[in-house]
Amino acid sequence: MDQFRNIGIVGRMGSVKVVESLRQLKQYLTANNYHVIIEEDTSTMIPGHGLQVASKKLLGEICDLVIVVGGDGSLLGAARELAKSKIPILGVNRGRLGFLTDISPSDLEERLARVLEGDYIEESRFLLDGHVERNGQPLGYGSALNDVVLHPGKSTRMIGFDLFIDGHFVYSQRSDGLIVATPTGSTAYSLSAGGPIMHPKLDAVVLVPMFPHTLSSRPIVVDGKSEIKLVIGETNETYPQVSFDGQMNIACAPGDIIRITKKPFKIRLIHPTDHNFYATCRDKLGWASEIAAS
């Protein structure tokens, strides 16, 4: 197990509860002689902290562990920036569901102590890269831990596009768009659109149509190493967008090409030893819960 001495802290902005956990983390870690580095935006949330301040990029270079305080969205943002550094990430849940941020604030110090003593499990999750081309030239790029989504933006018109997988034509479709999700993202937007839940260890990607104008279109699960290409129809009257984890958007135009592939490196997630994917699904999604009688 890794020995953690230099620990970075990243928090979601604008939350009183996050501030409470940040203060608790800072007090606990400094009292136990850990070198704590706080992310530069996060540092503004706790004035007078007296800690070293660094950008997310620098955290990836100088830390042994980064703790993210917030919801799954906060961890998604940190993961995209820290993936290349291969630094382990631990999540403290101050959001809603908490599929990725699985340490509860109520027992933060107890659970954190065990992790820092080496009592934890580690798993890797892959990300997606998305490249948008226009007239054969690069237009934009993004990465995603959950999903890359083609959507109509503010328009209510359908999008016409062609789908290719590994160079093979799959179909032409008119719909509200397409969700391309990792196993991590299969419990997020993809799930809401009728996609399957995939175990995080699967090397696979799911393609989920959004309100397709057909009765036969269904989600497709493909090899994680596949290259997915979307070609936006030339006759589209709408200008769709491509989003990455719902946090970054690239505006597209008719004729643009979107290429989606697996990122060459993965993120490292740290969990308490009692972490279990099925238990998480049961708890967060309400599996096997009974309807209470009125």
Curated annotation (Swiss-Prot):
Its EC number is 2.7.1.23. Coiled coil: none annotated. NAD(+) binds at residues 72-73, 146-147, 157, 174, 176, 187-192, 247. Disulfide bonds: none annotated. Its main location: cytoplasm. It is found in: Cytoplasm. GO terms for molecular function: ATP binding; metal ion binding; NAD binding; NAD+ kinase activity. It catalyses: NAD(+) + ATP = ADP + NADP(+) + H(+). Keywords: ATP-binding, Cytoplasm, Kinase, NAD, NADP, Nucleotide-binding, Transferase. The active site is at 72 (proton acceptor). One of its GO terms (biological process) is NADP biosynthetic process. SUPFAM superfamilies: NAD kinase/diacylglycerol kinase-like (SSF111331). InterPro entries: ATP-NAD_kinase_N, ATP-NAD_kinase_PpnK-typ_C, NAD/diacylglycerol_kinase_sf, NADK. GO terms for cellular component: cytoplasm. Its cofactor is a divalent metal cation. Pfam families: NAD_kinase, NAD_kinase_C. Belongs to the NAD kinase family. NCBIfam families: PRK01231.1. Involved in the regulation of the intracellular balance of NAD and NADP, and is a key enzyme in the biosynthesis of NADP. Catalyzes specifically the phosphorylation on 2'-hydroxyl of the adenosine moiety of NAD to yield NADP. This is NAD kinase. It comes from Marinobacter nauticus (strain ATCC 700491 / DSM 11845 / VT8). The lineage of its organism: Bacteria, Pseudomonadati, Pseudomonadota, Gammaproteobacteria, Pseudomonadales.
